[in-house]
């Protein structure tokens, strides 16, 4: 039986369950107490003190985010005393914050900017002091110390959710600040580039390196043929900031926008996701049936945040990664060989652009192991979903005027199996659909492997386990998202507590749909809802098995001969080195 607590907030008598915070109680009746540092279950430290309220009978104001409701409390969230204190607190925060909003990527989507406007703060009464720490601007993740408000969100998310501890507090008193742990440079840190610190920062102190100018230069270069790909997870989120409903924010409209910008050819990454499944699925069947996976499972390799993580934290397990490149890199390799030959041009003329939900993809593009086969990198530029939105706006494209345009040929088709790559469990499900076919010679029911789908991203420590029987073979699988959850799972594998044959890992909670390059909604976690959108698209797709993609089949006939062939190994696989 639930125990209820009765209290009064701003004259309203309410009843809430015990252990409810004052902030949660207020929100339950539509009273939005402002906050900057609060993240439910992650950062409840009352550091910013913007959420202070007045408790009748007490002189000192208390923070609403981490004080529990008690029987008979009388709370005032907007008394003169509260308003004066909150305003002074925000003015002090602004005195240590670079307020050049017009040059900040978060302008218009900044919690501090909104609170300052709501409090009618039009000038700063305090002398401004800004901290300037050096930063490597070539790194895919950028930190601007002058914008940091010391809310500690990045510290807590990296530590509690991702288990990496890249960020830490240094200094004391007035000189307290946040920096890379251990006085290291960011390149020396074990940063996986998941970007969760970016999406949980309430201001613009953390962002991705912008590569939009490089893309515009390529578009303007008459000697370049610009070819773009759009990742599955992007279609689930790009419309959020552009006023488009999920059902209207189609991949066809992204293709239209990119073509209007001047990009010559646009493809859907679901094609190369299907190609990845053909290679990775066949690789798994080969390694599994040969007995190679008796001691350790084969791990998926399409998430670069996870690949960076295993290289820095568990380098002895790198050999168990699938050798298949990610869909992004396979796409680039195919564009600069197969597609270049189709066009009759040299690979150097092709400029490949990836639109990704991910910051780590920017680093994956730059890794040495991806440009040994021919001149240049597989991928020339990576932009996040947020960068795509900025490019659409800067090109003066009205989202409401966009129409559905089909992707170009010959890499035109994509299957539902490729679409669900963007959600946790999607790669595993797609791989099992085709592995079943490889082993049995017939398709399984399309819904046969839904047990690997996450029911909610806070259950089972972020791990989904499932065993599947294919003929006389039992395949033991696990799916995990979030690097903190991943570390826990690997420790169990290492100790012998659990045994699997195939493990899918996604660095971001919920998978790519919750990626570090996706639109930011402060205080909201939208990965699960975005993931449901991708599963809907899969359910309604004409093709649901990667091995049935006619354009993939045709490419093997014309170019690669068969999955795992010598040519496929040269272009679609890689040797994972232990260094980042």
Label each region the model flagged.
Residues 1-3:
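Short, Lys/Arg-enriched N-terminal segments with co-localized hydrophobic residues
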Residues 9-12, 56-57:
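Short strand-turn-strand beta-turns centered on an Asx-Gly dipeptide
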Residues 12-18:
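A short N-terminal beta-strand-loop micro-motif at the entrance of redox/enzyme domains
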Residues 49-193, 206-221, 225:
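Fe-S ferredoxin-like electron-transfer domains
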Residues 195-210, 382:
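Phosphate/diphosphate-binding loops
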């Amino acid at each position: 039986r639930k125990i209820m607590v009765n209290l009064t907030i701003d004259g309203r008598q309410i009843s809430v369950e015990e252990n409810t915070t004052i902030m949660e109680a207020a929100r339950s009746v539509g009273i939005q107490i402002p906050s900057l540092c609060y993240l439910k279950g992650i950062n409840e430290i009352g550091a910013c003190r913007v959420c202070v309220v007045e408790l009748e009978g007490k002189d000192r104001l208390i923070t609403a985010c981490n004080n529990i409701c008690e029987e008979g409390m009388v709370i005032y969230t907007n008394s003169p005393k509260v308003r004066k204190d909150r305003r002074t607190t925000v003015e002090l925060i602004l005195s240590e914050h670079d307020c050049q909003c017009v040059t900040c990527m978060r302008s218009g989507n900044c919690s501090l900017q909104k609170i300052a406007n709501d409090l009618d703060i039009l000038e700063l009464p305090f002398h401004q002091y800004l901290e300037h720490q050096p930063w490597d601007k070539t790194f895919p993740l950028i930190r601007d110390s002058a914008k940091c408000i010391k809310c500690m969100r990045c510290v807590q998310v990296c530590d509690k959710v991702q288990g990496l501890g890249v960020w830490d507090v240094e200094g004391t008193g007035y000189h307290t600040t946040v920096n890379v742990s251990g006085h290291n440079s960011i390149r020396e840190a074990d940063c996986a580039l998941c970007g969760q610190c970016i999406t949980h920062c309430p201001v613009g102190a953390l962002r991705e390196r912008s590569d939009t100018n490089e893309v515009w230069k390529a578009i303007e270069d008459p000697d370049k043929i610009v070819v773009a790909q759009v990742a599955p997870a992007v279609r689930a989120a790009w419309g959020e900031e552009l006023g488009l409903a999920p059902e209207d924010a189609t991949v066809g409209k992204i293709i239209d926008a990119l073509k209007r910008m001047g990009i010559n050819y646009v493809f859907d990454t679901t094609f190369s996701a299907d190609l990845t499944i053909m290679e990775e699925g066949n690789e798994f069947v080969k390694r599994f049936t040969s007995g190679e996976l008796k001691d350790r499972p084969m791990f998926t390799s399409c998430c670069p945040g996870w690949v960076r993580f295993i290289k820095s934290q568990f380098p002895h397990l790198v050999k168990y990664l699938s050798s298949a490149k990610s869909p992004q890199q396979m796409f680039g390799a195919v564009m600069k060989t197969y597609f270049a030959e189709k066009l009759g041009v040299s690979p150097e003329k092709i400029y490949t652009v990836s639109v990704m939900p991910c910051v780590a993809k920017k680093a994956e593009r730059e890794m040495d192991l991806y440009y040994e086969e021919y001149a240049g990198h597989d991928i020339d530029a990576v932009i996040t979903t947020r960068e795509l939105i900025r490019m659409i706006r800067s090109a003066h494209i009205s989202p409401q005027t966009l129409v559905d345009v089909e992707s170009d040929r010959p890499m035109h088709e994509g299957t539902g199996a490729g679409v669900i790559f963007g959600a946790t469990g999607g790669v595993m499900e797609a791989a099992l659909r085709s592995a079943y076919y490889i082993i049995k010679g017939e398709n399984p029911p399309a819904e046969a492997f839904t047990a690997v789908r996450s029911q909610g991203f806070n259950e089972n420590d972020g791990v989904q386990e499932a065993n599947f029987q294919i003929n006389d073979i039992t395949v033991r699988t696990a799916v995990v998202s979030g690097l903190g959850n991943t570390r826990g799972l690997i420790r169990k594998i290492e100790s012998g507590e659990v045994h699997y044959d195939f493990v899918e890992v996604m660095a971001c909670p919920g998978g790519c749909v919750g990626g570090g390059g996706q639109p930011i909604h402060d205080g909201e976690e939208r990965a699960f809802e975005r993931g449901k959108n991708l599963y809907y698209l899969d359910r309604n797709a004409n093709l649901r098995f990667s091995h049935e993609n006619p354009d993939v089949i045709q490419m093997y006939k014309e170019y690669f001969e068969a999955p795992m062939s010598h040519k496929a190994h040269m272009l679609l696989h890689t040797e994972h080195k232990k260094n980042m």
